A protein has these predicted regions:
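Acidic, polar low-complexity linker/tail segments
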Residues: 2-59, 66-73, 77, 85
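Histidine (H) residue identity feature
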Residues: 9, 33, 97, 135, ...
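Short, Lys/Arg-enriched charge-dense amphipathic segments
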Residues: 45-49, 109-127, 161-162
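Surface-exposed acidic, glycine-flexible loop patches that form ligand/cofactor-binding
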Residues: 47-52, 89-92, 154-166
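Von Willebrand factor
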Residues: 51-117, 120-167
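Active-site cradle of extracellular carbohydrate-active enzymes
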Residues: 170
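VWA/integrin I-like adhesion module and closely mimicked acidic/polar interface patches used
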Residues: 173
């Protein structure tokens, strides 16, 4: 994963095709998608490639509980394009490899953590639409925000750190 580059025209074609559709029509999963299930995942890797010789891992963990579940929809339809084009235009980091995580409630939800691959191109959009928007949570103020941090610490590997001694970035929304 992590080869290719982001095509804003293809992304905006996706957003145009989803305009006016209900969130449930785009996010049709009613259980965790096998490609997003962290169970049994040893590593998710962000590696340098010919297209991205200085890959920088960037993880965006999104709260998908009932009170915040709309964020995944907004990020897929609007925020992803802004994120990628802003990074590519301003260049605060080199060769971004983006991973999305969906965060729920480990006490109440069936899918408290979902993880994409690291992607440098539009494949991230397809993975985003596979997210199971459980809209759960227990109202117990116990969303599992530590789960993405744990996964990133123990189940990711990236050339940015191994070759250049630079850490990646993780944002929890």
């Amino acid at each position: 994963m992590g080869s290719g580059s982001f095509d804003s025209h293809a992304y905006f074609s996706f957003t145009s095709s989803t305009a006016g559709k209900a969130t449930d029509d785009i996010y049709a999963s009613r259980t965790i998608h096998k490609d997003l299930d962290p169970k049994g995942v040893k590593l998710r890797e962000s590696r340098d490639s010919a297209d991205n010789p200085n890959a920088t891992p960037l993880i965006v963990a999104i709260d998908v509980t009932g009170s915040m579940g709309i964020l995944a929809d907004v990020i897929a339809r609007e925020g992803l394009g802004v994120l990628f084009t802003s990074i590519l235009d301003r260049k605060p980091i080199s060769d971004p490899h983006v991973m999305f995580m969906a965060v729920g409630d480990a006490n109440c939800d069936r899918a408290p953590l979902q993880i994409s691959q690291f992607e440098a191109d539009n494949r991230i959009v397809e993975q985003l639409t596979q997210i199971y928007l459980e809209h759960g949570g227990g109202g117990n103020n116990f969303e599992s925000y530590n789960a993405p941090w744990y996964f990133a610490s123990f189940h990711t590997a990236h050339d940015s750190m191994e070759k250049r001694g630079k850490r990646g970035y993780l944002f929890t929304v």
